[in-house]
Amino acid sequence: MTQTAHPDSVLIIDFGSQVTQLIARRVRETGVYCEIVPFQSSEEGFARLKPKAVILSGSPASALDEGSPRVPQVIFDSGLPIFGICYGQQTICAQLGGKVEAGHHREFGRAFLEIEQDCKLFEGLWSVGSRHQVWMSHGDRVTAIPPGFRVLATSSNAPFAFIADEARKYYAVQFHPEVVHTPDGAKLIQNFVHNIAGITGDWSMSAYRAKAVEQIRAQVGDKRVICALSGGVDSSVAALLIHEAVGDQLTCILVDHGLMRKNEAADVVAMFKEHYNLHLIHVDAIDRFVGELEGVSDPETKRKIIGRLFIETFEEEAKKLGGADFLGQGTLYPDVIESVSFSGGPSVTIKSHHNVGGLPDRMNMKLVEPLRELFKDEVRVLGKELGLPDSFIGRHPFPGPGLAIRCPGGVTREKLDILREADAIYLDEIRKAGLYDAIWQAFAVLLPVQTVGVMGDGRTYEFVCALRAVTSVDGMTADFYHYDMEFLGRAATRIINEVRGINRVVYDVTSKPPGTIEWE
């Protein structure tokens, strides 16, 4: 996260909503930079960022409770535009002289707004007398609005669904404009950012790239950087950005643990060495990893073994290089946002990649994290800006522990080889059908189950392969992809005919929730 003021930015105060990150995504989609800060440190964040507008998130808390989160007075005193969402509306009303009460009718899900008065925020979007779908999720409700406010829209259970004090540029809604279930929500946020706050949408990846290169050079100086290259989008984009900044001062290490997709390690090495002229060390550690994983069936034990072996292997290679002062990582913004706790202070949740967790402390290195202000979709845009091919940028997500967690039960070399072939055929059929970009993630799973089959004149007793494909926006929720049966039949036939060791194929039709996307 930036440590300095950022011109033309928006500050988002997080009161603990599960969808606060969606607010940030909507703001950035308008070409405007924003940051999320927990309510406990909102004054410091406000002073540091020096934003031109403030958005208040929802919350699981009740504005009626003693000690519930509040907006610092300095923000109201600043004269900046404020947009309160759900709990954000309730705390505005509670703090500025309105009234909030526990709702007798909790309102969750789809609702319809009736537009009663016009305002600048509605320009080019809504008109008086029109009706629009929104998404509600609240128990408490506003029952009296503060002096200076007027009601702009109502719903059947929320008589103050949309209120505003246009003189002070305060807008507050009971619904959630940031979610896709409010069709006009993104445009509302855009109107607030551009029309009300007057911020120009000129934040771009090319500008971010130039700034990041400058910051990396200032941080690293003439020192050396090593970067763990996994072959994924995040670590690859981070490595290219660092390389653009410091050139030969960067060395990348690709630890090949034998758990990647078919030909993946070779393809990554070829791309980075030949096309980008990166100093890349390819470590063949397949025997080391697979040897220790053989027979291990517990998913968490698999992860711990992979993480430990990666650190050991990486340390050994780094020592051969004579060490380095900095470690490059592809940490993203969702990994560093502070989560909000109502039982105490904020707890910082760093979702350390299984490969690099603990490396900086163990090796006495400082971190270079050039992507820590970006969301995943923004990293893909930056990757394109840096010249990575669309076929690489648009690849489906792949888990850190790789194929080890797509082999439920014990891992063996034979099972990994069988799975790798089945997965490659499945993805090939998806691409041939023109479905790859319509699916968020697709993969094969080799089940620890063998079944009887008949192939030719002989009886077989071989593994079952499960195929998985989901649609999703961010991986938090997902629905199984609805293939036609002809496609599934074609993919299954190829896998059974071409992969020795599989005689039955099934398709997973579980959504998330209740299931998860991966099987382990």
Curated annotation (Swiss-Prot):
Biological or metabolic pathway of the protein: Purine metabolism; GMP biosynthesis; GMP from XMP (L-Gln route): step 1/1
- Pfam families in the cross-refs: GATase, GMP_synt_C, NAD_synthase
**Domain GMPS ATP-PPase, residue spans:** 203-395
An example GO CC term for this entry is: cytosol
Q: Which UniProt keywords apply?
A: ATP-binding, Glutamine amidotransferase, GMP biosynthesis, Ligase, Nucleotide-binding, Purine biosynthesis
UniProt keyword rRNA processing present: no
The residue ranges of the Glutamine amidotransferase type-1 domain are 9-202
Q: Which residues bind ATP?
A: 230-236
Assigned EC number: 6.3.5.2
Report the InterPro entries cross-referenced here.
Answer: Class_I_gatase-like, GATASE, GMP_synth_C, GMP_synth_GATase, GMP_synthase, GMPS_ATP_PPase_dom, NAD/GMP_synthase, Rossmann-like_a/b/a_fold
Q: Which GO terms describe its molecular function?
A: ATP binding; GMP synthase activity
Q: Where is the active site?
A: 86 (nucleophile), 176, 178
The catalysed reaction is: XMP + L-glutamine + ATP + H2O = GMP + L-glutamate + AMP + diphosphate + 2 H(+)
First-level EC class: ligase
Classification via PROSITE patterns: GATASE_TYPE_1 (PS51273), GMPS_ATP_PPASE (PS51553)
The question of whether Nucleotide-binding is a record keyword is answered with yes
Xref: CDD domains: GATase1_GMP_Synthase, GMP_synthase_C
Per the entry, what this protein does is:
Catalyzes the synthesis of GMP from XMP.
Q: Which HAMAP family match?
A: GMP_synthase
Task: Provide the assembly information.
Answer: Homodimer.
Designated name of the protein: GMP synthase [glutamine-hydrolyzing]
Q: Which organism is it from?
A: Allorhizobium ampelinum (strain ATCC BAA-846 / DSM 112012 / S4) (Agrobacterium vitis (strain S4))
